[in-house]
UniProtKB/Swiss-Prot annotation:
It catalyses: glycerol + ATP = sn-glycerol 3-phosphate + ADP + H(+). Activity of this regulatory enzyme is affected by several metabolites. Allosterically and non-competitively inhibited by fructose 1,6-bisphosphate (FBP) and unphosphorylated phosphocarrier protein EIIA-Glc (III-Glc), an integral component of the bacterial phosphotransferase (PTS) system. GO terms for biological process: glycerol catabolic process; glycerol metabolic process; glycerol-3-phosphate metabolic process. The keyword Transmembrane helix does not apply. This is Glycerol kinase. Belongs to the FGGY kinase family. Sn-glycerol 3-phosphate binds at T14, R84, E85, Y136, D246. Glycerol binds at R84, E85, Y136, D246, Q247.
Length: 502
């Protein structure tokens, strides 16, 4: 009898490294997770230790196999998904980083971004990389490291230093320095990559003074990049055959591989991506144009919108307002009242993301009357997550001309049935919640498995995609639009709050 085979997905996130073992039916067999240190050298600066990222990720890989009681020769392939934009520069010879990883959340390169804007680069960057000028993306982080570590730019020109996002760093370590690659999805988040020519952009490299010699080779999201030995000693060599940035991996894990399919991930914030097929749609409504995975890991394009406060607003109800003891309580209290009694909560604690991009907006509660109680405020806070998702979807539909028929959802907050029903109500479209909630890891596993023939094609994967529950709109169009108009009025009044009058 042949031994049963499995796929391992490595999910390297912002606060923890995880490894997930899946079988041929896409069932999760075991999970291992390790958190690592968040480093805050100055206000607004965020770093990770790349060696700690590697140590936690490699140990979860060994651990997860031990937990599942399977041997390395039962692993058909490994897929990697990762926090995007986080930037690492290391020595080619020794494999030692020359500086800590600069994390996607880090704002230290705001001044470099202001220079780019003053130099009139906004339109070029939008047209060629699909992005907006923001410290979020990798390009300015690489420049900062080369500007601040003495002699590093010259060393990079001589080919002594390498740059990579987290996927590139992990593969370099897993292959003992034999393979220096990234995939199209991660490259598209660097602000150094031309999403139309599918190559590093010479003008961006010149403007940021980044030597091409230090950049990884860019490959498809589903192919064999190299092989690794788990534990580092002899034994079976396992192919590494899937890579995707976390949000694109979730899009693929939800099997949103056709034009017009979309998913929303409800975490601390919300990330909504819509596959636009082979067409890169330039956004006129505050969204990003990015690369996604097509049916066999080839290049598709997507529109992406990020909402800053989703689960974080529920944490605020719990930690600061003390209105609930646990995030799970929010559903119970929200359903104790029939409606919000006219209340709208705009959770713009750190400004507003897509499609408004207003850093001066601040959180506000509107419509308070003597009859408003805590349950109304809890309900209005939950509803704000759904309203913000509609804001992003309206922008997507305006940009793409595509009408959404169903939204696939994942992330912690999708367990909240009240929120999912209200999301369907306010969008006027079906909301589909999958049985397997680990869709980011699932996406990495699918990409890796397809590359080595573990799964033959997407049709085979579609059979495994079980929708656990479907939510359908339960309110009339007039009611939907009336409520949404109230939200838009509230947002307008919360905007520009911190802007100082002359």
């Amino acid at each position: 009898m042949t031994e049963k085979k499995y796929i391992v997905a490595l999910d390297q996130g912002t606060t923890s490294s995880r490894a997930v073992v899946m079988d041929h039916d896409a069932n999760i067999i075991s999970v291992s997770q390790r958190e690592f240190e968040q480093i805050y050298p100055k206000p607004g600066w965020v770093e990770h230790d790349p060696m700690e990222i590697w140590a936690t990720q490699s140990s979860t890989l060994v651990e997860v196999l031990a937990k599942a009681d399977i041997s390395s020769d039962q692993i058909a392939a490994i897929g990697i998904t990762n926090q995007r934009e986080t930037t690492i520069v290391w020595e080619k010879e020794t494999g030692k980083p020359i500086y800590n990883a600069i994390v996607w959340q880090c704002r230290r390169t705001a001044e470099i971004c202001e220079h780019l804007k003053r130099d009139g680069m906004e339109e070029y960057i939008r047209n060629n990389t699909g992005l907006v000028i923001d410290p979020y993306f990798s390009g300015t982080k690489v420049k900062w490291i080369l500007d601040h570590v003495e002699g590093s730019r010259e060393r990079a020109r001589r080919g002594e230093l390498l740059f990579g996002t987290v996927d590139t760093w992990l593969i370099w370590k897993m292959t003992q320095g034999r393979v220096h690659v990234t995939d199209y999805t991660n490259a598209s988040r660097t602000m150094l990559f031309n999403i139309h020519t599918l190559d590093w952009d010479d003008k961006m490299l010149e403007v940021l003074d980044i030597p091409r010699e230090m950049l990884p080779e860019v490959r498809r999201s589903s192919e064999v990049y190299g092989q690794t030995n788990i534990g580092g000693k002899g034994g079976t060599r396992i192919p590494i055959s899937g890579i995707a940035g976390d949000q694109q991996a979730a899009l693929f894990g939800q099997l949103c591989v056709k034009e017009g399919m979309a998913k929303n991930t409800y975490g601390t914030g919300c990330f909504m991506l819509m596959n636009t097929g082979e067409k890169a749609v330039k956004s006129e409504n505050g969204l990003l144009t990015t690369i996604a995975c097509g049916p066999t890991g080839e290049v598709n394009y997507a529109l992406e919108g990020a909402v800053f406060m989703a689960g974080a607003s529920i944490q605020w109800l719990r930690d600061e307002m003390k209105l609930i003891n646990d995030a799970y309580d929010s559903e119970y209290f929200a359903t104790k009242v029939q409606n919000t009694n006219g209340v709208y909560v705009v959770p713009a604690f750190t400004g507003l993301g897509a499609p408004y991009w207003d850093p001066y907006a601040r959180g506000a509660i509107f419509g308070l009357t003597r009859g408003v109680n805590a349950n109304h405020i809890i309900r209005a806070t939950l509803e704000s997550i759904a309203y913000q998702t509609r804001d992003v979807l309206e922008a997507m539909q305006a940009d793409s001309g595509i009408r959404l028929h169903a939204l696939r959802v994942d992330g912690g907050a999708v367990a909240n049935n009240f929120l999912m029903q209200f999301q369907s109500d306010i969008l006027g479209t079906r909301v589909e919640r999958p049985e397997v909630r680990e869709v980011t890891a699932l996406g990495a596993a699918y990409l890796a498995g397809l590359a080595v023939g573990f799964w033959q094609n997407l049709d085979e994967l579609q059979e495994k995609a079980v929708i656990e529950r479907e939510f359908r709109p339960g309110i009339e169009t007039t009611e939907r639009n009336y409520r949404y108009a109230g939200w838009k009025k509230a947002v307008k009044r919360a905007m520009a709050w911190e802007e100082h009058d002359e």
